[in-house]
C-alpha cells in the first residue's frame, strides 16, 4: 500500500530496536512514522519524548524485544506509559520478535515464568493489544488479559519456496527437534511435501551429533525449519544428520534470526545451501554469505490496517499456491 492512509487517527511510532522493519511497515500502511526522541542518561535510564500530539489517536508502537533485550523492553514500557499519559485513545504494541517467550513454563525447580511476567508488565503499563510474529510458544497468548494477534510466517515461507519450485514429493520438510513438529507439518502441508523429524536419545547439546531421522530424506531436497536461529548449532548439526541420510540439497528457514556470537562461523561450515529468515530482528553481527532475508513488513502492515478497521486478521493465516483453487 503506497497511498496515504485516510484515517489521521492512526499513528505509528518506531523505537530503536529495529527501525528498518518499522519504516517498511509504515510504507505498507501508508502512514509516516511519528516523531519521538529516545535517549539514555549516563546511568542507563531511558527518557522518551513524543514530539507530536497523540491525544485521541490509536497508536501502534513497533519494537522487537531483541538484544539488548532488557533495554528494548524497558524502552517499550516507557513509551507505552508516555502514550497513555498523553491521552492516546489506544496503545497497541507491535513486537515482531517477542523476547522472553522461551521462558513460558517451569522447566526445573524454582524457575520463573518470565514470559508471564513480561505480559503482566505490558498490560499494567497500559497496552490495549499486542501484535506479534511467531511466538516461540503459542500459549504465551494466554498470559495476557488483552487481545494478542500472533501472526504466522509459514505462509510467507511457503510462497517463497513455491516460487523456487521447491514443493511436492521431491521435497521433505524437516523439524530439527520434536518440539517443532507442528511448525514443520504446517509448512509441509502448504508445499504438499512429506515431513521428517530429527530426534535424540538425550535432549542436550552433547548428543546433538547422535540424532536420528524419523522419516525419509534420501534423494530429496530437505528444508529445515525452526522458529529461532540463535547459536546456529541446531541447524548445523541437523544439516549434517540430514546429509548423512542422503538429502541432495539442504535449506534452512527460521522466523527470527538472533545470531549469537559465533553463529555465522558455525553455519558457514554446515552443509546448508541457503538460509532464510525474516527481518523481525536487527543485528550488527556478521552474517553468513548464504543468508537471505524475507520481509514480514507487508504481513504486519496489513494486520495493522485490519485491526484498525475492525476487520478479521484470519485471512492473513491462509495460503493458496498459485494455480490452486481458492
UniProtKB/Swiss-Prot annotation:
GO BP annotations, alphabetical order: 5-phosphoribose 1-diphosphate biosynthetic process; purine nucleotide biosynthetic process; ribonucleoside monophosphate biosynthetic process
EC supergroup of this enzyme: transferase
Pfam families hit by this protein: Pribosyl_synth (PF14572), Pribosyltran_N (PF13793)
InterPro entries hit by this protein: PRib_PP_synth_CS, Pribosyltran_N, PRibTrfase_dom, PRTase-like, Rib-P_diPkinase, Rib-P_diPkinase_bac
Reaction(s) catalysed by this chain's protein: D-ribose 5-phosphate + ATP = 5-phospho-alpha-D-ribose 1-diphosphate + AMP + H(+)
CC annotations in GO: cytoplasm; ribose phosphate diphosphokinase complex
Cofactor(s), names only, from the UniProt record: Mg(2+)
Coiled-coil zones: none
Residues holding ATP: 43-45, 102-103
Top-rank taxon, per record: Bacteria
Subcellular location: Cytoplasm
Binding site for D-ribose 5-phosphate: 226, 230-234
Family classification: Belongs to the ribose-phosphate pyrophosphokinase family. Class I subfamily.
UniProt subunit comment: Homohexamer.
Protein name, UniProt field: Putative ribose-phosphate pyrophosphokinase 2
Gene from which this protein is expressed: prs2
